[in-house]
Amino acid sequence: MKERTFKKMIFAVFCCQFLSIPLFAQQQKVDTTHTYSIPEITVSDIYQTREVRSTAPLQVFSKDALKNLHALQVSDAVKHFAGVTVKDYGGIGGLKTVSIRSLGAQHTAVGYDGITLTDCQTGQIDIGRFSLDNVDRLSLNNGQSDNIFQPARFFASAGILNIQTLTPQFTKDKKTNIAGAFKTGSWGLVNPSLLLEQQFNKTWRMSVNGEWMSSDGHYPYTLRYGSAEGDLSSREKRKNTDVQTFRAEAGLYGNFSDKEQWRLKAYYFQSSRGLPKATTFYNDHSTQHLWDKNTFIQSQYKKEFSQQWVFQTSAKWNWSYQRYLDPDTKNSLKKTENSYYQQEYYLSASVLYRLLSNLSFSLSTDGSINTMNADLNNFVQPTRYSWLTAFAGKYVNDWLTISASALATIINEDVKKGGSAGNHRKLTPYVSAAFKPFHNEEFRVRFFYKDIFRLASFNDLYYEEVGNTQLKPEKAKQYNIGLTYSKNVCPFLPYLSATVDAYYNKVTDKIIAYPTKNLAVWSMKNLGQVDIKGIDITGSLSLQPWEKIRINLSGNYTYQRALDVTPPRSKHV
């Protein structure tokens, strides 16, 4: 269900013109020079019309839609988006990343309550650690959102997955909400969760939620010892696939007025996961293990000074820890054990100016400091200083929507040991438009173009024997043209919508692992060009055979072709 919020300002003098007001002995005089405001009105709309009107492909799952998917994690729900590949490394407890239109997980940003998540070590975000129990809305943007009032980081990727968590809602007579859930399933899955929401007064609200998940992952499989008919086979169970995770979140919400809000969120996550090895004949021994911890605190403040000027700011501190253990390594210590630490300090500020009712501009600037350390010998201990500034504009009328932006990126890197990867300066543009050729039909033609890049991760740059500090940013150019249509057909078919988008992505200076001296010695290189072509089709309809019964149907189709078009001579350099 889609919700839209309207804030209306009315003059008392207008009420006097249209309302008949009885006269009493002591009639209260109305100050006609003062502007009176009515409380915020929330209007609910059954159908998703924003996706059809957007200038770039947008897909949304509301809270009700997520319930109908019967998904356990965010990664399960994201698989239902068109043009998306969820890469699953290691099954139940493994890393799960999202890639949009074959560009790779490093080109896809993940936002959590309006602030992006980061991992400078790998450049990839594990979306498998987010549950759907406290998610209010999932949205996926290709290219860029039509919302120009957002942090600069939201302009700095080829696409973004937005995770919006629940905001406490209360009835007039109820100030406390408590909800619990217990899920269980195959392979020893146990998943309890608890949610507590409290309203202190009209201004302050709080929410606390947590969950624990455990699974042994011992799923059965058949191991065949030959391909010919009659060859031996045996029934086995996967080993070292256990996983235990714990997540806790706390939020404080300050609603000072309809024009001023503040939000504070604290997040903690930890996991313990077995790392199963490849299945081989007569050897199922596997003991590798991985431990993860992550915590962050983020704050957001928004103030609407007038109908023309709006300001918002965000701040975040993030800390993460990872420990890897292989007790069967053949070395003098008889094990391999490494620990990695990351920290981030992030600050953002944005201002929106509405020049006209249908023309607005925004300016956003973000600054961040990312550090990494490890218990490895001679580890370089890199630090990345990032400064992003985005200037954007948007024009909207009944038949045309145009959005454009320019992102300036400044990156400085420093290390305590060895050589650093150097600094980067780049300006990247974006433009999109949607045109409605017929006045009485919700039919639109849309297109967008975006020039973007992604930096090499700390692992790509500094990992022992594999890292390469000479790596250049991996660049991507995106082209998209599409058609959208929606219609209220009849009482039996109250809603019908469809979108068709064709796209072309060109990736240059692709960062890949490449063998150097022999197949046992690899290094990271800018060696590759990729052409990506595809079509995304989505459709949804709503049937209402009876007054109190509604049937919603939706589906999507994706065709992708990604080709390595690197010149043959370059491959042997």
Give the ranges of each region predicted by the language model.
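Membrane-embedded beta-barrel scaffold of Gram-negative outer-membrane proteins
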Residues: 308-324, 438, 445-448, 474-533, ...
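Extracytoplasmic beta-strand/coil segments of soluble accessory domains associated
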Residues: 75, 79-116
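N-terminal periplasmic "start-of-domain" segments of outer-membrane beta-barrel proteins
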Residues: 39-67
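A beta-strand signature from Gram-negative outer-membrane beta-barrel systems
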Residues: 132-179
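Short loop/turn motifs that connect adjacent beta-strands in outer-membrane beta-barrel proteins
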Residues: 34, 150, 168-176, 202-203, ...
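Flexible loop and strand-edge segments within Gram-negative outer membrane beta-barrel domains
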Residues: 217-219, 228, 234-247, 253-311, ...
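Gram-negative outer-membrane beta-barrel transporters
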Residues: 357, 399, 497-506, 523-573
